[in-house]
Amino acid sequence: MLKKEAERITGGLSAPGKMPEGSYNLPAAACQTGAKLREIPGTPCYKCYAFKGRYNFPNVKDALQRRLASLTHPQWVEAMTTLVKKKKHFRWHDSGDIQSVKHLINIFEVCKNTPATRHWLPTREAKFLKFIDPDIIPANLIIRLTGHMVDGKNATWWPWTSSVSTKTKTCPAKDQGNRCLDCRSCWNKKVKNVTYPKH
């Protein structure tokens, strides 16, 4: 499949400045768990960044909606494979989240089709992960279950987590211009938890 056709089908990739390479984002309003948490003070989703700044530009909103609509396209897996296959690192959902078990399984297929790419998928959709045995996750994909509360406890039933804290952090981005630079902890399965500072 040609790149132009892949972009037409999927809505194209996003390019968050913090990340080392591309990402794929969806509208934050479509987050199933996050949409509820956004109304609750003390959660990382409260006053969500994906409802501010450039995310409010009409062209960005349109692109997010195109990507959301593309998820059920019969060639979505093939198209995403075309766009991702030459990247060394890829982040799923710098905004938005998993929409269904089928969506998650399709992400698995993209990961299997791009074995040279390391994939990172942060999520708050624990209800979908409960259908998944961690042992069937592609070796080049790490799914980090993110805690629901700032300074809260991490899930113990899932092997990789991320959290937001007002007290500590392991993510160095804040100290280096809000960029990953050479850090790849989020993609590293040996790193069981990554803690981000509260925005």
Each model region followed by its residue ranges:
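Class I S-adenosyl-L-methionine
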Residues: 1-199
